[in-house]
Swiss-Prot record:
Residues annotated as glycosylated: N93, N106, N136, N157, N172, N217
Signal peptide residues on this chain, from the entry's feature table: 1-20
Protein name according to UniProt: Ceroid-lipofuscinosis neuronal protein 5 homolog
A matching Pfam family: CLN5
Origin organism lineage: Eukaryota, Amoebozoa, Evosea, Eumycetozoa, Dictyostelia
Record's keyword terms, sorted: Glycoprotein, Signal
Family named by the database record: Belongs to the CLN5 family.
InterPro entries assigned: CLN5 (IPR026138)
Gene Ontology terms: cellular component: cell cortex; contractile vacuole; endoplasmic reticulum; extracellular region; lysosomal membrane; perinuclear region of cytoplasm
GO molecular function: hydrolase activity, acting on glycosyl bonds
GO biological process: autophagy; cell adhesion; chemotaxis to cAMP; exocytosis; lysosome organization; proteasomal protein catabolic process; protein secretion; regulation of gene expression
Domain of life: Eukaryota
Amino acid sequence: MKRTIIILLFVSLFVTFVLSQIPDNDPELCQQRIQREDCPQTPVPWGTFNDNDEIEVYYMQAPVFEAVFGNFFGKLGGYHSAIGFYDLTTGLNYTAEYDAFFEVGNGTLPNIINVDGKDELLWCNAGILCTVPYINETYWDKNIYSTASKTYMGTINGTQLNQYIEWMQQYNISNPVYQTWDVWNNYGQDLFVPSTTCDDFTQQSIEHLGSIGINYNCSTVFKRDYINLFTEKPQPIDFTEHYDDIFKFYEAVLEIKEGSIAQIIERILSIIGLKKYIYVQGEYYLLELNYPFMNAKYDYITLPGCPANGIDYENGNFIHLN
């Protein structure tokens, strides 16, 4: 219960960002509070690399919400991640990362807005691949944020990087929605809904680079975040039939941040008696949560070609919804 309350308090931080960026009845409903110039609608392809370019690959992590909280969430294992490329031949550097286009809060929870006198749920949960021809050395610098890191993963050539660029642009097309939650029956084994976050992109980048020839040192520590829900198989429902219960649930979650700590805890506990829902690819699903209900993990990932020491994505029983 204590860990569940901590996770819900963490979610309430997301809620703060959600509610503060949407003015009441604003006709331009989904707007980025801060426009990321390095997150264009179409990712920068970086051009074509010479076949013999020597390029070092790095797995980069920095604490989430670092501008406000510094290292706080990094100490709890809460990170944003990206892949960095250092072209030793040309001296140029590149970053590839995936993010919520309208910020993480909107990728996690809806906004409740009034349309013609009726409350509606507005989701602004687009995901976007951000690619820039540089590496922000300050953001990923452990001398500035002690929990930040850049981990050398291996070296590739220009041909392999060109292949990766094609793959990452297809990833952007195939993953248009940011999904915060991994929805499991049993952690690491039975997965109903996979998340689509920065960590999923970096993990799949590492896997794809392995498939096109990078050789990993199996002693390299490769870890990532998971924000997990635990449930029996989610059941698809009709939105109109469940309208009232869906609104009660999301209103309760969105109100968590209001009031004193005691009131916040009271609101968290009040959610226990409500029906729980999740929104996946345009559909709502009813959840029957099971123990431990929800948690966050900073866990190992097995590198391609190495002995399993974390979640085995090749051999796991990934059930999914369909």
